[in-house]
Amino acid sequence: MQDQTARGYGEFAKGWPVVFSAMLGIGLGLSPLPFYTVGLMAKPLVKAFGWGYGQIFFGVTITSMVVPLASPVIGFLAERFGVRRVALTSLFLFSLSFMAFAFSSGSLALFYVNWAAVALFGAGTLPITWTRAVNNYFDVRKGLALGLSLLGTGVFGYVGTWFTAWLIEHYGWRAAYVGVGALPMLIALPVAFFAFHDVGGVGQTGAERKVSDAA
């Protein structure tokens, strides 16, 4: 029992940067940001372009359609290049594509294309990418580590909603898209760049990574 406790402390001593960067990456990724902010953005978009609420929220449906198509590609890229490269690239492109909403001109077609781009480029920020590395770092405290990683969804869902409302009220919806979209690039990306690393080499299974790390 004491040995397991010591191993658990050792895991967190080594792996807490991965957990922290995963929490930020998930919390500022595709899972929460578009879905928690679309309701706040809908009213100013209706006022600006005369769109219906149903037309605006259809963007969420597009995201739900694109993600299942993009997920196998993300999985292949993660196997080929490693989850670190996939996560960092996806954070950067997701941030840019989300900020691109600020340039909406009233074309619903382009608005929907933007939603598709957000889903496509942001698929690598979904929890499966981050939790793969967390899963490989932890054994004894794996459940706790995964739980802490997923904590970011709720935390940044709340913070993102408040921040979006504040930006809309003080600077308008275009600035809100830029401000919220910049969060992954300015917060999650730098932390992940320095702290998010997978165990072992690219293309290894989780068991192989543990063996190579212990050798």
Where are these predicted regions, by residue range?
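Helix-to-loop junctions at the C-terminal end of transmembrane segments
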Residues: 69-83
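C-terminal ends and interior cores of transmembrane alpha-helices
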Residues: 92-106
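Hydrophobic core of transmembrane alpha-helices in multi-pass small-molecule transporters
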Residues: 27-28, 97, 108-125
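Glycine-rich segments within core transmembrane alpha-helices of 12-TM secondary carriers
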Residues: 139-161
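Intracellular juxtamembrane helix-capping segments at the cytosolic ends
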Residues: 45, 124-138, 146
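Residue-level signature of mid-helix packing/kink "hotspots" within the transmembrane helices
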Residues: 36, 64-72, 157-158
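Symmetry-related core transmembrane helices of the 12-TM Major Facilitator Superfamily/SLC fold
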Residues: 175-194
